[in-house]
Amino acid sequence: MFKSPSSGNRSLQLEALPPLDVSSSLLCELSLECLAHYFTWVPLSNTITPNLLSTIFHFAAFGCEVRSSYHHHHLHHRSGGGGVLITGGGGVNTTGATGGGSGVPGSPATGGERVGGGGNNNNNSSRGRSGGGGIGGSATSTSANAASATGGAIANTPVSASTTAAAAGAAATCPSNGGGGAGIVAPANTQSLGVLAMNCINELLSKNCVPQEFEDFLLQMFQQTFFLLQRLTKESTLNTSGNKLADLDECYVEKFTDFLRLFVSIHLRRFESNAKFPVLEFLALLFKYTFRQPTNDGFYSCLDIWTVFLDYLHSKSEMRTADHEEVTNRYKPALQSLVSHILQKLQFRYNQSQLEELDDESLDDDSETEWQHYLRQCLEVIAKVGEILSQETFQLLNDLFQEYTEVYLGLEQYVVPNGAHGRKLTITAENECRRLHCILRDLSSLEQALGRMAEHFIGDRFIKNFTDADNLVQRLVHCVAYSGSAKLYEVSSIAQTVLQPDFIEVHAQALATLKAFAHWLSQYHSESQKISQPLKFTILFSTLVEATLPLFRKQIPEKIVQSAAHLLLSLMVTVRPSYLLQMTAVHNLYSQIGHGHCKDMPQEVQLLLYRALSHYLLLPWPHLSDTDQDWEKRAAYHRDFTRQLTLEFCQLRDTQALVENKALQESAKCLIENTLKMCQDWIENIASESNKSKQICYQSLHEIVQVTLAIFPVYIHQPDTADHILSFFLAVFQGLRVQMGVNFTEGIIQTFMGLFTREQLTENILHENSAGCRVVEKFLRILELIVQEPGSAFKAFLPSIISVCMDQIYPVVAQRPSPDIKAMLYKLLFEFFLNNWRYYFKGSLLSTLNNQNSEMMENSAQFIAIMQAFGQSFLQPDIALFRQNLESLETLNTKWKLYHKKVFREALLYQFLNVFIQVLLQKSHDLLQEEIAISVYNMASVDFDNFYTQFLPNFLNGCDGLAADQRTVLGQNFKMDKDMPSFTQSVNRFVNDLRYYRLINSSLPAGSFKF
């Protein structure tokens, strides 16, 4: 069965595979399974012969046959190498062998590609055969003109003689039960053979290291692949769609897709310039294979293959700039056709029946609906093509966008008054409403696609592509202004439930697309300032702002408001021209927001609005000198704006009322949370800006900080509210510590130290929910910032900080199995050592130069206690904490020579060595085996002689489960090497031998002789 045809009979077809009995089928399956396992561990070599490869492809071709509808049994795949167990008898014997494989796409013998499915029309006549349409002559059932407009770039590529010869040669190795006939039905047991054969081929293909003499062998493999691809993409007469892939075993199609992915990602670069491998014909077949995938997952996998290919082309053109135009021109028709067909596949206009089946409500783990995932996958490939053919890709998108916006902007003529019911849409025909629905959905998709192209219009391409970008942004601004004035989502129609979400989506997506062009607007602003011609930009930007600001009302759909808030933030932060405060609409928005007009909106929208309006006043205006920034006026404006927003919060300063009135205390929680979230958001987003911006921000928030500090004692026993308060203070310490000043910072720290008593800390740590632990962690994070502070300003707090850590927190968390707080506690202790080493070691430079004892140490008992706390963490199962503390010790040794210190050598060194070797013996932290061995080396290298003569014998004497002679052998076999590689190797051998002796001894009966 595995004998390959002789070279002299290559032109002859093999006879049809006879029905296999169970034993013959199992023999073939096990043989292929063994080959797959064999290929996983052998390199490409002469043992893998062309005859063997041809035989494997012989079996791979069986998977191309349509499954029998009479005797197709379920195949149970083995978990190992993909083996298959067939239940039942043999398959149906096939008759009427048809010869030869089909030609490559574009040849007269090839059936036309069918893309989409087009609405509800399933007329078989739409599957017309053509010799030169799109890639494969594509024409959709709903619009043949639209499909043919995309052109036949790849399909019309002439087929080289070598390709035809290769296909014919490959065909000879495949059985006649399907040499191209679409009506052949495969025996059930041959399906599994095809899957197993593809496993073997994929194992070969997954090898990245290919000897040069083996490349011809791989070339033969890929030439044989042409035949299989032609078979797979051939028209079928067994289903109404004419798609053969829909009738094949899903596992086989998946394996073949894996094959294509491996080829493109690993081997295409080897053969892309090889005259014997026609890349364009291969892409034509890959194209047909992509758009005939019967499942969305299969389609996504094929898009991933195209993404890999496009990345390869992009990197190739970038590395060889001289050949950029040649590479681009070679693949331009193919890539344009790819974009055109992806656009068809994602448009409801052509593909409504399939796209309507995609769920657009339930979110997956990536917070995407099924439709959003489908659209994103398509747009990512289009964007990849845009990196290579930016102008051509943009033109394809923009032409459709212009067409759809013409319809959208003309809808107002169909809107008429409807008495007390507002307005109504006069389009009443069902097919016209369906057409409008498709146009609106497609317009939203195109807006999103154009947003992905925004990066191609900025930087050094700004001037070159300015006209296209300007026209597009003008059009988008017009759409936003029109959407805001027309309010089409308020219009009633016979398809209200369908069209209303469509109108909302178009408006929201137009705003989101303009957000993507914020950097282009910023560069436009900059360029207009350079040439002293800002008028055109000012008109455009003002129109956009005036169309966006009225959208912040509760009557506006939430989706539109959210997009508008994101856009406004980008405009205020990225562009921020200086004249905005002079606009009446902007001035009114500050007033409305300050008086609480957006409090009914979602909190995310509120935070975006507050940040946009705050940052416009805090950040320096671009292209203006510091003297022209008008900081004084802006600071006053920001203080007034902040005061309006926080007026109610500042009234909580009277803490006596909060203490006495529990109802007021409870009702104030929401106000405290919202106010502190807003202020925290401001601080976190201003933290990396200039000192001037942070100074104005702190001046506005100074009263908020004081009030928050005053109410903290009231809520110290309520972890949820205390968590928000500590989050705010942590942001203040991280972003505005310099602006607060030393005195005020000291006051805050003293307040915290007084509040966080041992009882309070214990209460928070043991609280039933995680909020209490979060409070303690944030308190420790604030203390960490204090110990990291250079200079002597906060040195007075160091004893108190150590006391809090070791006397109040560590005793509570040390024996708890939960990792909560521990990581932050050890991080604080590490930072304490790293930044305040002289707190323990007072040695001076002079004493070091005079060879005097420079280890004048203070608080040695405390130092040892902290180090023992680190050692305790190495006895616990938490591997993340183990890694963190191991790295901490190594860092301290690198910077401060920790292991060399006398106190460490005398009191701690043996303890740590013992713990680390015990951990290696127990294999409890095997993921860190190498790191632990290196730490053992660094500790032993302090005094190798002491390690070999003192520690090692003592360690062996203390080991249970060993005989005396075994201890002697272990000690003698530990080589006294002093270089790290040899030492760590000795440690690992020592640990393995010791573990082996213990295992052997424990398995012997009592009284047995021990080796």
What are these regions (language model features)?
Residues 94-95, 168:
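N-terminal amphipathic/basic-hydrophobic helices that include classical n-h-c signal peptides
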Residues 1-71, 78-85, 107, 114, ...:
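Karyopherin-beta/Importin-beta family HEAT-repeat alpha-solenoid scaffold
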Residues 92, 98-102, 107, 114-127, ...:
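Intrinsically disordered, low-complexity repeat regions enriched in Pro/Gln/Gly/Tyr
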Residues 70-77, 119-125, 166-169:
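Low-complexity, intrinsically disordered transcriptional activation domains enriched in glutamine
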